[in-house]
Amino acid sequence: ALGQWIEERCLLAKSHREGVSELFADWREWAERAGEYVGSVKRFSELMAARKFEKCRLTGGARGITGIALRPKPYSHGYPYRDD
């Protein structure tokens, strides 16, 4: 399931860096929709490390992962700022 999420939702390049919390939040949303086991942030980080993604520190000290970034989300609601 993690491989499918990476394929569908992520971009891979050595220069990419993304926060662990952002990646995990997207993974959780995707996994819940797909009926997959979400697990913990720790487990997620371990699975990413097993796939040879390296940990890094982002500006401000936040934990990140190198070599991966989230794809921009498509607008699913048509008008995200529509004033009803």
Spans of model-derived segments:
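Phosphate-handling catalytic cores of nucleic-acid transaction enzymes
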Residues: 1-4
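Positively charged interface segments
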Residues: 7-84
